[in-house]
Amino acid sequence: MTLNQTENMVTALLTFSFAVLGLTFLLGANPNALIATFKFYSLDTMLSESALGAFSGIALLLLPLMTIAARFNLVSAKAVTLYAAFVTAIPLLTLLSPTRWMADLGGFPIIGSGQGIIKYFAVLPLFLFLFYREKFSHKQLTYLNFAPVAMVLLWIGGMKFFEFEANAIVGLVETSPFMSWLYAVFSVQGASNVIGGFDVLFALLLGAGIFTKNKPVIIASGLACLSVFLMTQTFLFTVPDTFNSTTIVNRLGQFIIKDLWFVANLAVVAYFTLFEAVSREREETQLSQSPQ
């Protein structure tokens, strides 16, 4: 995978995911999420529910348009990166609200509705890769993009060991042709423990592989982590009523679409840990063989 291919993949995943999120909010999906976000800033009473959806949808739709424009040097890299930071900071700051945590289980770090919010940590490292790559070392960009992958797998994976989360994923697992067999082998909690253990194990192994520069470990654990985020995309098609004619996808669909950001993070990690040296060597060979 070349640098250009990696850039195109990251751009495509960002563009598609934010376009879907923007359209769904614009069409009225998941209004409670918007109300909770704007309530944190005491702005929930200033706009109607439909106006909140329109405002948020347009704001999110602007990001993929600016990203594509910046790739063609029609918009400055600084402008699109700052806008991405602004768009993602708005939901991320709401993690300071106690409503994002399970109060009956002691609050932080037992995450509740914040599970969909922490995914926004994945976005800014992707824009730094696209537009500020020369400002960072390859090692820094690798860890910047690994960090959100590790965070979501360790954090949400860790929640799988709690009863509330085990019960929450039943609707996802039992309708999946790839995962429903777990309930034939394990209890609801046991299956959740297996899923959580898988997430935690391979997040740690990927970190170890990157730290030790062990390519076989990076490949094996990276593919395992990738499988987690690709598997969640199948829930779009296996969970009933995720798609609808009114808002494209529902709240669950929005939650799932965000996992495409982690696929992009993993693509960046793969490029710098597995492909960058090969790509550079190929370019140097081509230059040496070209007529002087």
PLM features per residue range, with description:
Residues 1-62, 68-166, 186-197, 208-292:
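Extended, low-polarity transmembrane helix blocks
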Residues 173:
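Alpha-helical phosphate/pyrophosphate-handling elements in metalloenzyme active cores
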Residues 176-186:
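Membrane-helix boundary elements
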Residues 203:
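Conformational-control "hinges and anchors"
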